[in-house]
């Protein structure tokens, strides 16, 4: 086998990167057919790579054996106030013929990210079904932080205790809103987010969402009190479930919370059934969602509801 050569990523490698990414996505779709088919075409895959390469601060590396390009890795920057001084390897930001070569690519690219760009927080979105690739990332110091999930939408009946929210529910929804962020901020997640919006700004945002007929905002009531809520919207509105992770015509389950005192009572299951019923009524066939892997409740609840992991967000922080 020819020796591996690592070079900086440049435009001359875009077509090769598209071919590698298309092959990766084809293998991914063999494990999860609900993912979008079009990125099995090298030209479509190359467009995703090019979009990353044109992003501010993009940099990376390619791997060659002889004259053949056998891997690439691209990193971009996102908002520091959310992610810290960061570099992201996005959905279309990497593909290799041999998983071990990913480690060499990362070693080359990360030298710039850390030593020159001073960006020590690294994130990578990796196909969950490719165990060898996930393992290669783990052997350069990455661990699981977040999971994307997908499933077919099952036929379901509306539970009596769940209904669509109306503007009259806004105060109850405001009271419920901190439940998720409070839970995520605790052990073992320790999530950090943006400062909370003021109540008036959040009220206006909720009312705007409730007026949007493309959305499904569900509430679960017990004894006249809203104890849980799910929010659904077209997946096209999501910046997370995009590109290779967004099936055509999918619905996003984008927010979900139940009060701590009703967990285990069936409220979450009832809301899930109502979410399926609403989505089927709207003509959707596929649902996507995501969760923090370290969130013990979510990481058990969503797979138990039939969601299969599609991508894992891996994370490494270099002190």
Language-model segments: which ranges?
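Acyl-donor-binding surface of acyltransferase catalytic domains
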Residues: 68, 77-80, 90-159, 311-319
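A short, acidic/glycine-rich surface segment
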Residues: 132-135, 235-243, 297-300
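Short amphipathic alpha-helix that is part of the acyltransferase structural core
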Residues: 1-42, 159-198
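Conserved hydrophobic beta-strand within the GNAT/NAT acetyltransferase core sheet
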Residues: 122-125, 253, 287-291
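Short acidic/polar active-site loop segments enriched in Thr and Asp
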Residues: 59, 119-120, 285
């Amino acid at each position: 086998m020819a020796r591996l050569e690592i070079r900086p990523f440049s435009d001359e490698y875009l077509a090769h990167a598209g071919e590698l990414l298309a092959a990766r996505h084809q293998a991914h779709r063999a494990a999860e057919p609900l993912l979008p088919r079009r990125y099995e075409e090298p030209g479509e895959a190359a467009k995703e790579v090019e979009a990353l390469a044109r992003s501010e601060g993009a940099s990376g590396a390619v791997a060659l054996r002889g004259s053949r390009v056998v891997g690439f890795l691209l990193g971009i920057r996102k908002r520091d106030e959310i992610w810290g001084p960061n570099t992201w390897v996005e959905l279309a930001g990497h593909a290799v013929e041999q998983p071990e070569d990913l480690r060499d690519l990362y070693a080359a690219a990360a030298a710039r990210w850390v030593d020159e760009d001073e960006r020590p927080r690294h994130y990578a979105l990796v196909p969950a079904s490719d165990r060898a690739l996930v393992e290669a990332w783990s052997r350069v110091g990455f661990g699981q932080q977040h999971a994307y999930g997908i499933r077919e939408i099952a036929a379901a009946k509306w539970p009596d205790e769940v209904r669509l929210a109306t503007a009259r529910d806004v105060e109850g929804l405001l009271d419920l809103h901190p439940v998720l962020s409070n839970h995520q901020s605790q052990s073992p997640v320790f999530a950090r987010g943006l400062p909370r919006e003021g109540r008036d700004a959040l009220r206006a945002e909720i009312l705007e969402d409730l007026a949007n007929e493309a959305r499904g905002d569900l509430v679960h009531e017990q004894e006249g009190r809203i104890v849980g809520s799910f929010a659904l919207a077209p997946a096209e509105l999501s910046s997370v479930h995009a590109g290779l992770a967004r099936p055509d015509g999918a619905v996003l389950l984008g927010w979900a919370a139940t009060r701590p005192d009703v967990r285990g009572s069936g409220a979450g299951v009832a809301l899930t059934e109502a979410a399926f019923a609403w989505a089927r009524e709207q003509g959707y066939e596929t649902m996507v969602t995501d969760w923090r892997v370290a969130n013990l409740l979510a990481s058990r609840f969503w797979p138990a509801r039939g969601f299969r992991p599609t991508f894992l967000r891996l994370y490494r922080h270099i002190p």
